[in-house]
Structures are given as structure tokens and as C-alpha cells.
């Protein structure tokens, strides 16, 4: 009885077969992925805490040159930020608000340019398609195919040289 399986092993195999079938179905559908990030899009403005973190990092590195842990820097900065009063946080908040205003202007310009840039290529592409359609409609299908064949034969002649 070397090849015989127990009932438990047979059930486990059946469950695996069901799971593998279920796993194959979503892959077959082909999910739509996220659109890639635009490298030209302005970076978001930092909050007051992150403005503070930029300065605190430099101080922390000077005081603790051997400590390279990002977690230690973050923890120390968080504790220090909590201990600051509102008046001590005010310069960081003001700087963050200034950066946020600059970001809002930059993102508005980006969005304005993006919408104009997106509309222009669509119109140009539509005109090109219309022009091609007009040229092709004057010719019969056989003439269009002959033109395509002629273009391909030119490439073959270049290879011989």
C-alpha cells in the first residue's frame, strides 16, 4: 500500500486544487495598474513637524555622530516636538504655511499646463487621423495595400547594400 493516500491527504489535495484554480482566475482577468507618477509634478509641501525635523536632524547628527539609526532620530524629534510650546513651534508653522502657499501656486500652474498639454496632443492626433482617412478614402483598398508593399520593398533593397 505504498501509493495509497489517506482520506485527510486526499482532502488536502482537493483543497489545494480549489485554491490554485481560484488563484488563476484573477490573473487571467488582467488588472489595471496605477498610472505612473509624473516626475514633473511638484512635491507636496512639508508640514510644520517636517520642517522642524529637517533642522533637528542636523543638530542630532552633530551631537550624536555615531548614531546612524533613523528610528532614534525620529523618536528623539517626536519627543522634542511634543515638548515645544506653541510659541516655539510658531516659526516652523509659519515656514510650513509659506511653503504650502508656494506649493499651491506650483500645483495650480502644473494642473493648468497639464490640462492644456493634454488637450493639444488630442486635437493634433485627431487632425492627423482625419487627414489619413481622407487620403485613404480616395484610393481603393488594393491601391493602399500596394503602397504598403512598396514601402516594405524599399527596406529590403537597403539591406542588400
UniProtKB/Swiss-Prot annotation:
InterPro entries: HMG_box_dom (IPR009071), HMG_box_dom_sf (IPR036910), HMGB_plant (IPR031061). Pfam families: HMG_box. Residues 114-123 have a biased composition (Low complexity). SUPFAM superfamilies: HMG-box. GO terms for cellular component: nucleus. Residues 10-27, 77-89 have a biased composition (Basic and acidic residues). It is found in: Nucleus. Its main location: nucleus. Residues 145-161 have a biased composition (Acidic residues). Residues 1-46, 60-91, 113-161 are annotated as: Disordered. Residues 42-111 bind DNA. Belongs to the HMGB family. This is HMG1/2-like protein. CDD domains: HMG-box_AtHMGB1-like. It comes from Triticum aestivum (Wheat). One of its GO terms (molecular function) is DNA binding. The lineage of its organism: Eukaryota, Viridiplantae, Streptophyta, Embryophyta, Tracheophyta. Keywords: DNA-binding, Nucleus. SMART domains: HMG.
Amino acid at each position: 500500500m505504498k501509493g495509497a493516500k489517506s482520506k485527510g491527504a486526499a482532502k488536502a489535495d482537493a483543497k489545494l486544487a480549489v485554491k490554485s484554480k481560484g488563484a488563476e482566475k484573477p490573473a487571467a482577468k488582467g488588472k489595471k495598474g496605477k498610472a505612473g507618477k509624473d516626475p514633473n509634478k511638484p512635491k507636496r509641501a512639508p508640514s510644520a513637524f517636517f520642517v522642524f525635523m529637517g533642522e533637528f536632524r542636523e543638530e542630532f547628527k552633530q551631537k550624536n555622530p555615531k548614531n546612524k539609526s533613523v528610528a532614534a532620530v525620529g523618536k528623539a524629534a517626536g519627543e522634542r516636538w511634543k515638548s515645544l510650546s506653541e510659541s516655539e513651534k510658531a516659526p516652523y508653522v509659519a515656514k510650513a504655511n509659506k511653503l504650502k502657499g508656494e506649493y499651491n501656486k506650483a500645483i495650480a500652474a502644473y494642473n493648468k499646463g497639464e490640462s492644456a498639454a493634454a488637450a493639444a496632443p488630442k486635437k493634433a492626433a485627431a487632425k492627423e487621423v482625419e487627414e489619413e482617412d481622407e487620403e485613404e478614402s480616395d484610393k481603393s483598398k488594393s491601391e493602399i495595400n500596394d503602397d504598403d508593399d512598396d514601402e516594405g520593398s524599399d527596406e529590403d533593397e537597403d539591406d542588400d547594400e
